[in-house]
């Protein structure tokens, strides 16, 4: 055997002795579901499995309550209960001394069950501003929530919320608008959409009850002057007609009763109507 062949054989034997697992297949760990959104205090069934034929050890790591429902050599089925907050479940298996793991992300949500719309003020003059406010109590996660404000079928405003927003607070969206003549015939409403598709959940929607504005035309200064003048003239005519009727009545009475009767009537006349 040549020296080159001898060296090649030596290297091959060394590799077999020092690296016995170099040809060993890499195994995988799977978890079902990979992600899911649940309501508070819910329970969830989780399946952990592996491609390793004879795993040495395996299981599910979580701080929540768990029960092993069933198992075989390559899989374990658990019930996780009392889920009250977002959490990560970790499935793991060890095969030939090597450990692999896979995580399942669980999100806790509360859907929008009540959407409250407020118009302030409800009586608005044409051209004046008013505020539309939408409130949704106790909804989470807020970063998956969007509030839409509508005037009829027109979207006036949409409001999203960042991840930094605290959970289980009241979500609020406001929008300032200017009233026009047609607003008195339009419905205002709010739509809350909680989109949990990216978290392994569904889309939840809730509408507010529709509200309407009372719209009126503002009175200009010149119109106000005309109204005040007309009212003053009418009031003066009314007072004058009352005085004329009184004087005419007393004149007729004087003709019937004489001077004495007129003087007596004059004394009975209130001071306000005397010249």
Swiss-Prot record:
Which is a Pfam family this sequence falls into?
ICAM_N
Gene Ontology CC: cleavage furrow; microvillus; plasma membrane; uropod
Q: Quick one: a GO biological-process term for this protein?
A: cell adhesion
Keyword annotations? Cell adhesion, Cell projection, Disulfide bond, Glycoprotein, Immunoglobulin domain, Membrane, Repeat, Signal, Transmembrane, Transmembrane helix
Q: Where is this protein found? A: Membrane; Cell projection, Microvillus
Q: Please give the residue ranges for the topological domain Extracellular.
A: 25-223
| Residues annotated as domain Ig-like C2-type | 41-98, 127-197
Membrane topology is:
Single-pass type I membrane protein
Q: InterPro entries per the record? A: ICAM (IPR003988), ICAM_N (IPR013768), ICAM_VCAM (IPR047012), ICAM_VCAM_N (IPR003987), Ig-like_dom_sf (IPR036179), Ig-like_fold (IPR013783)
Q: Where is this region: Required for interaction with EZR, MSN and RDX and co-localization to microvilli?
A: 251-275
Query: Where does the signal peptide begin and end?
Result: 1-24
Which residue ranges are assigned to the Cytoplasmic compartment in the record's topology?
249-275
Give me the glycosylation sites of this protein.
47, 82, 105, 153, 158, 176, 187
| Entry's Gene Ontology molecular function annotations | integrin binding
Disulfide bridge map: 48-91, 52-95, 134-190
Q: Where are the transmembrane segments?
A: 224-248
Write out the function statement from the record: ICAM proteins are ligands for the leukocyte adhesion protein LFA-1 (integrin alpha-L/beta-2). ICAM2 may play a role in lymphocyte recirculation by blocking LFA-1-dependent cell adhesion. It mediates adhesive interactions important for antigen-specific immune response, NK-cell mediated clearance, lymphocyte recirculation, and other cellular interactions important for immune response and surveillance.
Quaternary data: Interacts with RDX, EZR and MSN.
What is stated as this protein's family in its record?
Belongs to the immunoglobulin superfamily. ICAM family.
Matching entries from PANTHER family are given as: INTERCELLULAR ADHESION MOLECULE, INTERCELLULAR ADHESION MOLECULE 2
By what name is this protein known? Intercellular adhesion molecule 2
- Protein source organism: Gorilla gorilla gorilla (Western lowland gorilla)
